[in-house]
């Protein structure tokens, strides 16, 4: 169990730091997204002429918000779950079931990692240029010049998958430690501000 705890502590600290930064960026992305959508509604219905880039900008914010918040929700148990069977099982059975589901999730995440990189970020679409989003002040960056490269949007999926893999490995280690009787040595991951469906 000492080896597992030695693996868990650095990973837990890394996830704490990375997910805290991701949360701040995700909240900023949400604020930008809301402002862009409200601005688009205002310009469309009041001035009868909405800028064409606001929709794509809002989508950009939504993708990054989702990619950065999904790992935090996964870690804190914030996803919707049907846990009747888990609650009906004894503690060891519930932990084994949770461990099996986390291993299946890990396998799915590894497949998604490949798809996120090869089918989105490093694909023909990902290498393309945005139709309407441009860098401010006419700045030219890379092969797309003043337009955003699509990779900046599609990278949200791949970054989110990487963070989900880190969280999944941490949760697997925590379940293994629980099976070995070390549950009392684990810190509680549920945030105080995390809403639940209980």
Pin down the residues of each PLM region.
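Alpha-helical transmembrane segments and membrane-interface helix-loop junctions
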Residues: 1-198
């Amino acid at each position: 169990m000492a080896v597992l705890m030695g693996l868990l502590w650095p990973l837990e600290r890394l996830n704490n730091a990375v997910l805290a930064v991701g949360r701040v960026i995700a909240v900023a992305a949400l604020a930008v997204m809301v402002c862009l959508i409200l601005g688009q509604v205002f310009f469309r219905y009041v001035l009868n002429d909405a800028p064409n880039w606001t929709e794509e900008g809002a989508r950009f914010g939504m993708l990054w918000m989702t990619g950065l918040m999904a790992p935090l929700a996964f870690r804190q148990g914030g996803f919707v779950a049907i846990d009747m069977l888990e609650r009906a099982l004894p503690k060891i059975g519930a932990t084994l079931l949770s461990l099996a589901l986390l291993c299946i999730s890990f396998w799915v995440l590894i497949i998604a990692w490949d798809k996120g990189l090869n089918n989105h970020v490093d694909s023909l679409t990902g290498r393309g240029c945005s139709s309407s989003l441009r860098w401010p002040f006419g700045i030219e960056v890379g092969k797309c010049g003043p337009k955003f490269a699509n990779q900046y949007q599609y990278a949200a999926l791949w970054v989110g998958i990487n963070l989900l893999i880190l969280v999944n490995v941490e949760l697997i280690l925590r379940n293994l430690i629980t099976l070995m009787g070390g549950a009392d040595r684990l810190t509680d991951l549920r945030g105080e501000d995390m809403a639940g469906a209980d």
